[in-house]
Amino acid sequence: MTRAFNFSAGPATLPESVLRQAQEEMVEWNGVGASIVEISHRSADFMAVAAAAEADLRTLLSIPDDYAVLFTSGGATTIQALLPLNFAAPGQAVDYVVSGHWGKTAIKQATPYVDVRVAADGQPGGYVDIPPVASWTLSPHAAYVHITANETIHGVEFRDTPDVGTLPLFADFSSSIASEPLDIRRYGLIYAGAQKNLGPVGISVVIVRRELLERAGQPRADIFNYASHVARDSMLNTPPTWNWYLLGLTVKWMLEQGGVAAFAQCNAEKAALVYGAIDGSGGFYRNQVMPTVRSRMNIPFFLGDEQLDALFVSESKAAGLLALKGHKAVGGIRASLYNAMPVAGAQALVAFMHDFQQRHG
């Protein structure tokens, strides 16, 4: 069987070696006589899986000891609703910087609980740039400042960590975590749905400075209290064990490949290939994002019309290049180049782009 190159924005491609190991261990895992999905999450066997996943993630991301690591059910949208409940008092101001679609989603989730203030918004310019930090209107007593590190739909990425002074900086890293070195101490909290760079859909990671967990937040059920989850090692309720196991395999694979530094180099190479094909096409392919904030993970581009976009998607699929259709909110084409996408995938896409232009340009 030949695997195609999968450019899906998420759920996204996973390392083939991880998938094959999971396939082998699905029915019977580690000599216990049962599948990993069948054993208790409180058994010594699974506790070892969970501990290894956290230890490897701490190594991969250089997570300091004064930061807690949570593995949570669900995705980033759930986390966005829980942030104000855990870290802001009722009616307290929180600042949000909107650089694309998912920044707006984060605001929608927080609005029922706190006084959401938009510190900056790239919408007037069409989300092709991020407003400079000097132009942000920050609330002096905000509970936190929230950014979306990488916007998968508009293809806009923070290339540097913004300086927000003494305010805690919270960031959605769902689509760019582990893609390049990150100084976690610059953040109060980062979070990520796993289904792009860390593993399968259904589990997320929250990395939070422990002192922030002492905040009273708002009245909430224990299941929505991050401090309670930390106290119970992310097992306050039954966790998604299969997803946790796959996340652990994926993180271990990333370490074996050379860690974040190696992926940063690889990701830069892949992005340069695709952007080079776009910029060198004489306008046949178009990407309007400012070069200083172009995403390395998600590259949207457009052809002359919707019919040509559709033809590109259908012909690329026939050529073994999957899931290149752009998000419904913007249309066009989108290539997602997460860590598990090899350079060969970007090379195959660029070769197809050149061929398609020759035939239809």
UniProtKB/Swiss-Prot annotation:
What are the recorded GO MF terms, alphabetically? O-phospho-L-serine:2-oxoglutarate aminotransferase activity; pyridoxal phosphate binding
Give the HAMAP family listed for this entry.
Answer: SerC_aminotrans_5 (MF_00160)
Q: Which GO terms describe its biological process?
A: L-serine biosynthetic process; pyridoxine biosynthetic process
The job of this chain, per UniProt, is described as: Catalyzes the reversible conversion of 3-phosphohydroxypyruvate to phosphoserine and of 3-hydroxy-2-oxo-4-phosphonooxybutanoate to phosphohydroxythreonine.
Could you say which cofactors this protein requires?
pyridoxal 5'-phosphate
Q: Transferase: is it a keyword of this entry?
A: yes
Gene responsible for this protein: serC
What is the protein name for this chain? Phosphoserine aminotransferase
Q: How does it assemble?
A: Homodimer.
